[in-house]
Amino acid sequence: MEPGFWHEKWQQQLIGFHQQDINPFLVKYWQTLALPADAKVFVPLCGKSLDMCFLAEQGHQVIGCELNELAVQQFFEENQLPMNQSAEGEHQHYQTEQVSLYQGDIFTLPQSITAQVNGFYDRAALIAWPESMRTQYAKQLAQLLPSGSVGLLVTLDYPQETLSGPPFAVSPTWVETHLSDDFEIQALACQDVLADNPRFVKKEVPWLNEAVYLLRRK
């Protein structure tokens, strides 16, 4: 997935991956992490997700990383949040009281930015990568997260041959095989969400499972 792919999606507003509501798994399971209210929470490939507003409402300091400039600007505009912008190395830093977004490549994000995070939340990042690049992303995420940090991972799984991603299918087996070296993994829930996703129904995908995992960085 080249950067130009995502820039084009945002430019044309072909952003079906953007959810208009807060993710139900986030609302239901976030408190199981037992993070302090003032915890710092990292959100990779954050887009303009409303989930960040939910995290900020819990009292957390949200640190996001997003490739596309338009996505970051729309987050602050649509939520009517005043922000300051500054250059920080290769990234542009957009900051408001509880949300700091770094616009740029997650693979060049300095580890110092996430060195103090307590938690993390990945809903649309892992599933954005084809299998050929997914392990590289997972290793980068692990490198950015301090030992002991806890978070939620939300995945989608379906017969990959029935639809070209993104989002790409990520099975429980893939999660266990490729993340267990760096994370303790606890599966929390899994449900069929096919009826809520017309694109998958139209393509006659037989099933679509959304799963949520609790991850703890080793």
Curated annotation (Swiss-Prot):
The reactions it catalyses are:
S-adenosyl-L-methionine + a thiopurine = S-adenosyl-L-homocysteine + a thiopurine S-methylether
**Which InterPro entries does this one have?**
SAM-dependent_MTases_sf, Thiopur_S-MeTfrase_Se/Te_detox, Thiopurine_S-MeTrfase, TPMT
Picking any one GO molecular function of the record gives: thiopurine S-methyltransferase activity
What keywords are annotated for this sequence in UniProt? Answer: Cytoplasm, Methyltransferase, S-adenosyl-L-methionine, Transferase
**EC number of the protein:** 2.1.1.67
Which residues bind S-adenosyl-L-methionine per the record? Answer: W10, L45, E66, R123
Q: Name one GO cellular component term.
A: cytoplasm
* Compartments, as annotated in UniProt: Cytoplasm
GO terms classed as biological process: methylation; response to metal ion
What HAMAP family does its record include? Thiopur_methtran (MF_00812)
Name this protein carries in UniProt: Thiopurine S-methyltransferase
- This protein's species is Shewanella sp. (strain MR-4)
